[in-house]
Amino acid sequence: LVGNAPGGAGLECQFSGPTLRFQRDAVVAVTGADMAPELDGMPAPMWRSFTVRAGQTLALGFARLGARSYLAIAGGINTPPVLGSRATFHQAGIGGMEGHALKKGQAVPVAESADGAEGRAGRQVIAARRPPLTGEKNWQIEVVPGPNDDWIDEAGHARFLSSDWLLQ
C-alpha cells in the first residue's frame, strides 16, 4: 500500500496501538485488526494508504476485532536487520528498536522513500481481499500430532478431536 520493498519494516501492534506524532510528511497504511485509527482526533481509514503531515498525530486504539494491527510507513522503519529480520524479539532483547517495544517519547527512524511516496496515498486493499474479521467466537483449529502422541490411545485421540473446547 505504501510501496515498501519486501522485508521493509513496519509496526505490529498487539491488542492496542501507539499514538505517534509525525516529524515529517509521510504516507502510511493501517491494516489488520480494527484499532479505530484516528488522525488528529478524526477517523482515519483502514486498508488504504493516506498522507500524514508533519506535526499531525496518528493514534491507534484498542482492537475491536482481531488482535494485531500493522502500520506501514513509506520508506519503512529504518532498523538494522538482525539474523535476517528487522523484527523485535523481546525475550532475547534483539532486533527492531534496540530489542524492546517502543517507549514513550522514543523516535522511530523512518527511511526516505526511494522514489517519493506522495503519489501512493489512496491505494487500497479491496474488501474481497481483506481477511474476514468477525465477532465469531467458534473457531475450527488444526491439530498437529506431537512427538509423544502415541501415549494416547486411538479412543483418546478420537475423543480429543471430537470435543468442543473452551479457551480461556
What are these regions (language model features)?
Residues 1-168:
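Conserved "landmark" site that anchors the functional core of diverse proteins
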